């Protein structure tokens, strides 16, 4: 199960992305306010959208099960996890993030740690951070 939970603008900028895109709903007026998706992003287009939405409106977490998706070794999320961070860091920099913040630190440390961990352990760790 995806480790979804409440988040906000500040936590998103720290890299706490706990929003499963399959179950994300938002108002059409918010989409008109912040949309569309930025086509320059391939891996972090949803992260960019969540940050822009959180900047103009509170995000509300509902703990009900709204959707399912399959997470396996061939998904972009897992197979190219290291390629998402450079795009997330572009969003972070655009929002005024500092080079010594939590997200840049995670971006540097995660490839070193995750290279040695099996998939199930990586998924378990993801729930903790």
Model-derived features: positions:
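Membrane-proximal basic amphipathic "stem/tether" segments
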Residues: 93-129
């Amino acid at each position: 199960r995806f480790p979804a939970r409440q988040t906000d603008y500040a936590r998103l900028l720290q890299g706490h992305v706990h929003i499963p895109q399959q179950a994300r709903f938002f108002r059409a007026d918010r989409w008109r306010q912040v949309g569309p998706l930025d086509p320059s992003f391939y891996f972090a287009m949803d992260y960019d959208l969540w940050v822009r939405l959180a900047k103009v409106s509170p995000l509300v977490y509902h703990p009900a099960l709204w959707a399912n998706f399959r997470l396996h070794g061939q998904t972009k999320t897992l197979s190219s996890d290291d390629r998402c961070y450079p795009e997330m860091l572009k969003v972070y920099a655009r929002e005024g993030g500092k080079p010594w913040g939590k997200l840049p630190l995670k971006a540097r440390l995660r490839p070193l740690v995750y290279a040695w961990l099996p998939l199930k352990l990586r998924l378990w760790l993801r729930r903790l951070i």
